[in-house]
Amino acid sequence: MADVRTHSHQLQVHPQRQHEGGIKVLYPQSGPSSTQVLAVFVGVPIGGTLLTIAGLTLAGSVIGLMLAFPLFLIFSPVIVPAAFVIGLAMTGFLASGAIGLTGLSSMSWVLNYIRRAGQHIPEELEEAKHRLADMAEYVGQRTKDAGQTIEDKAHDVREAKTFDVRDRDTTKGTHNVRDTKTT
C-alpha cells in the first residue's frame, strides 16, 4: 500500500508596528521617577545659588580690576619686573619639586627592581653552580679521554718501533726481528 502523506502549509502573520519616532522614544512612557523629581527640586536651587555666586565673583573681579588699573599703570615699572621675578621663582620651585619627585620615584623603582631581583639571585646562583659543575665534569672527562688517546698512540708508536728494529745478519742474508725491550 502506498503511504500518502499530506503536507500542511503554515502561514505566519506578523502584525505591522507603527514606527514611534521623534522625541517620544527618548522619554519613558510612565513619566519621571520620584528620584528624578527629587534631584530636580534639590539641584535647581543649589545650581542657581552657585551660578549667582560665580556671577558676583566675576563682577567683583571686574570692578576691582577697573579700580586697580590706574595704580597698576602708575606702579608698572616696579610691579612688572617684580611679577616677572616672582613668576620665575615660582617656576623654579615647581620645577625643583617636579625633579625631586621624579628622582624619588626613580629611586623607588630601582630599589623595588633590586629587591625583586634579589629574590631570584639565589636560584640563579644555584643554577650557575650546577652548570659550572657540569661543565667542569665535562672538561675533566674530555681531558681524561684526550690523555688516554695520547697514551694509546704513544704506546702504539713505541710498540711499532720496538718490533721494527731489525737485526741484519749479513752472513746468512736473513732478517731477524729483535726485541729491544729491556727487562
From Swiss-Prot:
One of its GO terms (biological process) is reproductive structure development. PANTHER family: OLEOSIN (PTHR33203), OLEOSIN 5 (PTHR33203:SF61). Residues 144-183 are annotated as: Disordered. The chain crosses the membrane at residues 37-57, 66-86, 87-107. One of its GO terms (cellular component) is membrane. The keyword Membrane applies. Belongs to the oleosin family. It is found in: Lipid droplet; Membrane. The keyword Transmembrane applies. This is Oleosin 5. It comes from Arabidopsis thaliana (Mouse-ear cress). It comes from the Eukaryota.
